Amino acid sequence: RQTILYGLKGISAYGHQARELGYYSDEADDFYILALEALTDDRLSVEELIRLTMRTGEMAIEVMKKLDEANTAIYQNPAPQKVNVHLKKGPFIIVSGHDLKDLEMLLKQTEGTGIHIYTHGEMLPCHGYPGLNKYPHLAGNFGGAWQDQQKQFDNLPGCILMTTNCLMRPRDSYKDRIYSTNVVGWDGVKHIGKNENGEKDFSAIIEQALELGGYPEDQDVQEILVGFGHHATLGYADAIVDAVKSGKLRHFFLIG
């Protein structure tokens, strides 16, 4: 039952993100309700619960497909892209979480302001999407894993926008410059919601980022390569197979 519940949490998270972009799966939605009901049904046998667990996995894949369809239909298929992981001088906003639509809205509203936008954590893959990396002020990625955010956000001379997922208790050193949006939030943290048209006004975080000013000097450029989604990777399939056969490629590492 716990495994099913964990699976449903993932299904709801990815399903919500897809729905924010206008995509959803009736099959996954119907299963979600049935599975929630089954979690409280003590009449189910172990065999029935195992079958339900396997079905949960199938629906997780289904909703991931739907989210991938949404992301690629709107922002195009990811392609390899170099990303600077150090900060430039000037005002900046760091965007963390999962919601590509929030990132896009912020990029549009900060055009021409001189503000650099940096991804953080699981936003890093956004740099591979042509529909997002077309914005020149999407300047790079900041920091590492989400669990290090309290240390990495400490005393930053810029603002942070937390979209869905991975917000930890903010320290006092940056609580006045961190904002939340979508389904994430924290007591005392400024929240940016939708208007009646489904749009968001990011003027408050933009104004504060300009006031803070950012760093006075550029940091040395250090780049990493992202954008190898399944579509891009399959484009190199023949070269990968040849490298394996020749012994040039001997190890594959699964992360996540």
Specify the residue positions occupied by each region the protein language model found.
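Metallocofactor- and cofactor-centric catalytic cores in central/energy metabolism, strongly enriched
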Residues: 1-256
